[in-house]
Amino acid sequence: MAGTAQGVQTQDVIKISATSGLTPAPQARDHKVEIAKLIDVSTCIGCKACQVGCSEWNDIRSDINAQCVGVYDNPVDLDAKAWTVMRFNEVEENDRLEWLIRKDGCMHCTEPGCLKACPAPGAIIQYANGIVDFQSDKCIGCGYCIAGCPFNIPRMNPEDNRVYKCTLCVDRVSVGQEPACVKTCPTGAIRFGSKEEMKIYAEQRVADLKSRGYENAGLYDPPGVGGTHVMYVLHHADKPELYNGLPKDPQIDLSVTLWKDVLKPVAAVAMGGLALAEVAHYLTVGPNVEEDVEDHHHEFEENKPSKGENNE
């Protein structure tokens, strides 16, 4: 995808965690090409080369031997040292047994729930090209990003109490290279480029699948999170849950939206109003509370009857 490389070299931040409309994040200086990774599950063979490529490039090692329980999934789940995992499912569709394989990892949502939920300033950022990246040095280990993710992706590392996930190889993409998983895929099931290019290619793959009898083939790019920068071509796009629980209509939890978009701004306005009221009080009344007390004391002493008067 050499033609896309120039458009994704500059990493401009457009969103930062723990900001709101009252404290807006910086915006990209100009338009940057939105990138996307397209995973065609119909051509994936489950070889796990992408897992190895991710592990090698990011220098992370999950304790896979401890998790091997007689299944193909190994490691059996994402963790702080396994940012991509192959999911294997046997399903019966149209009286046929099908073997569905899906590469699982961060979806890099256009409207990321993790970023919206994060209370730590700068711990999660989103670039103009769509990549959502965690800044581990600013993570406070609260785990709110885990609760805010509709795909259940981020994982806490018990060793340093910080959260990690796939970065979409932002370090490679920023210098015009493709992600490590794309580089290592032997069948071309994982592709990378501008989102527009990937959607055009996905249309071709969907048309091919439909011509082969998969009537409900389609592109998985859920609108509930504004679309994603990791997309899937699925045989059964009408039933994404068949692919190891891929959510059909993922959305940011209402409690997160209510907290960040309603309650937090209202609280900020209330605090601002209180500050203005204090300033107004200072300007109109003045900071003479202690002086008033002292004045009343002097006035009391002056008006206090003498001992002779009391005796009378």
Swiss-Prot record:
Binding site for [4Fe-4S] cluster 1: 44, 47, 50, 185
One GO CC term, this protein: plasma membrane
One GO BP: cellular respiration
Compartments reported by the entry: Cell membrane
UniProt entry tagged with the keyword Repeat: yes
Cofactor(s) annotated in UniProt: [4Fe-4S] cluster
Cytoplasm keyword on record: no
Record: residues binding [4Fe-4S] cluster 4: 118, 139, 142, 145
The entry's keywords: 4Fe-4S, Cell membrane, Electron transport, Iron, Iron-sulfur, Membrane, Metal-binding, Repeat, Transmembrane, Transport
InterPro entries listed in its UniProt record: 4Fe4S_Fe-S-bd, 4Fe4S_Fe_S_CS, FDH_Electron_Transfer_Unit, Formate_DH_bsu_Proteobacteria, Formate_DH_C_sf, Formate_DH_Fe-S_su, Formate_DH_TM
Main location class: membrane
Assembly and oligomerization: Formate dehydrogenase is a membrane-bound complex, formed by subunits alpha, beta and gamma.
UniProt function note: Allows to use formate as major electron donor during aerobic respiration. The beta chain is an electron transfer unit containing 4 cysteine clusters involved in the formation of iron-sulfur centers. Electrons are transferred from the gamma chain to the molybdenum cofactor of the alpha subunit.
UniProt protein name: Formate dehydrogenase iron-sulfur subunit
Protein's organism: Haemophilus influenzae (strain ATCC 51907 / DSM 11121 / KW20 / Rd)
Lineage, uppermost ranks: Bacteria, Pseudomonadati, Pseudomonadota, Gammaproteobacteria, Pasteurellales
Gene name as annotated: fdxH
